[in-house]
Design a protein with these regions (language model features):
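Short, glycine/charged-enriched secondary-structure capping and boundary segments
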Residues: 44-47, 76-78, 98, 132-133
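Short beta-strand elements at the ligand-binding edges of bilobed clamshell
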Residues: 77-89
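Short, structured loop/turn "capping" segments at alpha-beta junctions
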Residues: 1-2, 27
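Short beta-strand-to-loop elements that line the ligand-binding cleft
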Residues: 2-6, 63, 85
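Hinge/cleft segment of the Venus flytrap/periplasmic-binding protein
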Residues: 87-134
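Hydrophobic alpha-helical
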Residues: 7-73
Length: 134
């Protein structure tokens, strides 16, 4: 396992780090841990063309986190196996809940924020589609 963190979070710098990882002969998978990092992985792949969803055929499996249009397109076309998306509706709900509780002097606790795995087979599902924002 190798972890790479660029000095700044830009698609270009994430792409440089991802290219270094994807160029290694023994690379079997890569994860972009946020929208910028995932888009960096995809930008790196534009030069290398190693990502896909068929590990048995030698593809490097790519997975991302978030749901911007670039990541969704990569999931739809099979460049990424899938990605994890957040629930913006529930994040906003819990933010308002916490703000109201704080304004009323109540003690705050950690709140859950759900994440959902999506791939090309479930992007239109009732539970997933509302969370695939741009």
């Amino acid at each position: 396992m190798q972890v790479a963190v660029p000095a700044q979070t830009t698609v270009e710098l994430c792409s440089t780090e991802a290219q270094a990882i994807l160029s290694q002969e023994n690379c079997i998978a890569i994860f972009g841990s946020n929208q910028v990092a995932a888009e960096g992985v995809l930008a790196a792949n534009a030069n290398l063309n190693v990502l896909g969803s068929d590990a048995a055929n030698g593809d490097v499996i790519g997975v991302g986190f978030d749901a911007g249009s670039i990541i969704k397109a990569a999931v739809q076309d099979g460049t990424f196996l899938g990605a994890v998306t957040q629930s913006p509706l529930m994040m906003a709900y819990y933010a308002i809940y916490a703000l109201t509780a704080a304004a009323n002097g109540q003690e705050l606790e950690d709140v859950p924020t759900d994440g959902y795995w999506y791939d090309s087979t479930n992007m239109d599902d009732e539970e997933i589609a509302p969370n695939l924002y741009d």
